[in-house]
Amino acid sequence: MAPKAGKVVPVVAPADAGPPPNLDFIPHRIAVYERLKAAAAAELASKPRVPITVTLPDGRQLPGTAWQTTPYDLARSISKSLADRTVISRVNGVLWDLMRPLEGDADVALLDFEDDEAKRVYWHSSAHILGEAAEKAFGCHLCFGPPTDEGFFYDFGMPATDAHGQPNKHSAVTEDDQKRLSTLMDGIVRERQPFERLVMSKEDLLEMFRFNKYKQVLINSKIPDGTSTTVYRCGPLIDLCLGPHVVDTGRIKAFAVLKHSASYFLGDAKNDSLQRVYGISFPDKKLLSEYLRFLEEAAKKDHRRIGQDQELFFFHRMSPGSPFFLPHGMRIYNALKNFIVSEYHKRDYVEVMSPNMFNADLWRTSGHWQHYQEDMFTLEVEKQQWALKPMNCPGHCLIFGSRERSYRELPLRVAEFGVLHRNEASGALSGLTRVRRFVQDDSHIFCQEDQVGSEILAQFDFLETVYGALGMQFRLKLSTRPEQYLGHIDTWNRAEATLREALDTFAARTGSAWELNPGDGAFYGPKIDIQIMDALRRWHQCATVQLDFQLPQQFNLTYMAAEPPKAGEAKAASEAKAGETKTAAAANDAKAGDAEKKEDGETAAATTTQAAAAPPPGYARPVMVHRAVLGSFERFIATLSEHFAGKWPFWLSPRQILLVPVMADAEGYVREVQAALKARGFYVDSDLGANTMNKKIRTGQLLQYNFIFVLGAKEMQDRSVSIRVRDSKGDLTTLPLDEAVARLEKLRDEKALGTELVEAGKKA
C-alpha cells in the first residue's frame, strides 16, 4: 500500500509579494490528467493477476502477483526500515518506480541514497518539488528540471502578466525569492504528495501543455508523431518526464535552495532568457549540514577569489570569456607548459604550430562547419568565409598530409599549444572553467591499428607522471559504440577490444579499476574519459583519449605500408571500404552534433556520406588518436588553484622565496642573495620597505610564499640564510647559502609537493 498523503499546507504569499501569479493553466492541466488517469486505471485493473517470482541480488526469491505487487511491497515485506530508506528499484536492469507494479517475473534490486543512480533519482524528484514551488510562487512556465552531479536545478520562464492581466514586474529571481521557494518546498514535503506516473500520447501532451510554449517545443521536437511518453504528477504539478521518482515528496528529508542565475532556452542566446534555481537535498539533515560546510570551504578556495587575491588573472568586459594572465599567473602557466614539453621530449612527440584561422572549406571537410558552426567565431575575408579554430585536429591532418608518409614514421605524435576559440554563450561563462579563448596541451597521434594498444598504455603512463607530480588521483571510463555511429562494426569491435585490453593491463599493474560507460562513445570512435579528484574530493574532466577512424578518411590520409600488396588485395580492400559508412543519418544525427559541443570533444560529425576512396595498393589509412593530459590550461589552472587552495607547491609556485632583512645594514646581503637565487632560475622577491620585519613576514605569508628568508648580521657573517616555511609556527631553520640553493634546486627539479628543503637543516 502506498503511503498516505498528509494534510495539504496552504500557500500564503508574503505581504510584499505583489499581485498574485496567474495559475489558470494548472486546472486545465489537472483536468486532462484526471481524464487520462481514469482510463489508465481501468486498463490496469483489466490486467491478469498471475503469480510471478521475484529474484533479489543475493539470490533470494519472493512470490508476487503480476500487475499488483510493487517493489515497495517487496521492500516492506522484508522490513519497514528497508522500505523507508529505499529510494528507487532496478527491475531487470532498468530503474523502476517503487510504486509501479511488476509486470512479470523479474530480477529486482532495491537502491538507497548511497547508490549513484538512486542519488540522481532523489535529486530529480527534488527538482520537481522545486518546480511546483516555482509555479506557485511566480506562475512561471517550467522548462527543464534535471538532476546534476551535485544536486538539481530548474529552468523556467517568468510570465509576461500577473493574475490581473497587468505586465509582470517580477522578471527575475531574487535572494528573497530563494527564501520563499524554500518555504514553499518545505510545505510540499510535509504534504507527502505521491509521485504518479502516466503514459500519454503526443496529441494529449500538446493539449495538456498548450499554455507552456517551452513544453510545446520539446514535445514537437523530441516525440515522434503517433508515439507516447510519460508525465509525472506530484500535487498540482504535472511535468513531462521519463522518471522514475521516489514514492512521495515526504522522502526528501532535508534540502536547501542554493543559488539562482539566468540561462537560455535550449542553451541558445537567440532564445528566451530563463531563470535557473539550484538546490541540493539529502535523506537526513546531518548530510545536508556537512554539504553546506563543504560549500563554505569550497567558496574560500574558489579559483576566481584566489586569482584576484594573488594577482594571477582577471577578466574584462571588453573581451568576455578571454582571461588576462598577469605575470604571476604566467609563471604557473609556463611551469605547467614546460613540464609537458619536457615529457614530450622524453616521449618522442614533435611540436608544431598551425594557423589560428582557416578557410571554411577546411571545416566543411572535417564536418565542423555543418555541426559546430554556431560555436565558432566566423568572419569574412575577401568575400570568403573563415573561422577561428575551435580545435587543432583538422590542422594536424593537413600537417600529416603535407607529404608522403611511411610506416617507419609511425606512430607520429604531433603536439601543439594552439590558441583555440569557441563561441560560448555569455551566460555559460564561468571564471577559467568556461571560457571563449583557451589553450590545450593538444596532441594527435597518427599510428597503425596494431599500435593503438601500446599508444594507449603510453598515455596512461603520461597521466601517472603528470597527475602524480600534482598529487592527484584519476579514474578511467571507457565509452563504447553509440547507437548511431560511422565506420565498420568490425573496426569498432577491434578498437574497443584493444582499449579494454589496455585498461585491463593498466588496472592489473596499478591495482585500480576502470568503469564502463556503454553507448557513450563519440560517433567516430570509442574513447576513454579521464577524471581527476581534487583535495575537496570533487571529480573534474580534464584529460581525454579518443580514437578516430573518420578524420583520416575525410582528409584522405595515407601512409606507405610495410609490405607490397598481394594479388587481389587491392580489390578486397576496396570492397571492405564499401561497407565503411553505416548510414547517412548517423553523420547528421543530432546526438552526434550535441556530443561535440562538449568542451572535451574535438571532432564534429562528418557529413560526407560517401567514404573516401580506398588507399591505393601499398598504402594504408592511419588511425588517429586525440589526446590531452591537462586539457584546457585555463580550466586546469582553475582546478589546481582550488586543489591547492592557492598554496602552490614550490616547483609550480609563482612566489617561491621572499627575502626579509632584519635591519638596514643587511640590505646589501639581501640583494646578493636575491641575485644568486635569480641566477638559478628561482622566483625571488625582497621587501626592503619601511614596514617592521614582522609585518613583512605576515605579508609574505598572506601571499603564500613557500619560503621566507630572514637575513641579519649573523647570516651575513656566516653566509647563511634563516628559513621560515609557509604555514610554520614561526620556527626558523638555518642553512649555508650554497646548501640552501642546492636543496631548492632539488625541491624544484624533483617537483616535490612538500617542504623537504629544511628537514635536515639546523634550527636557529
PLM regions: where:
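NTP/phosphate- and nucleic-acid-binding module
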Residues: 1-143, 147-149, 155-764
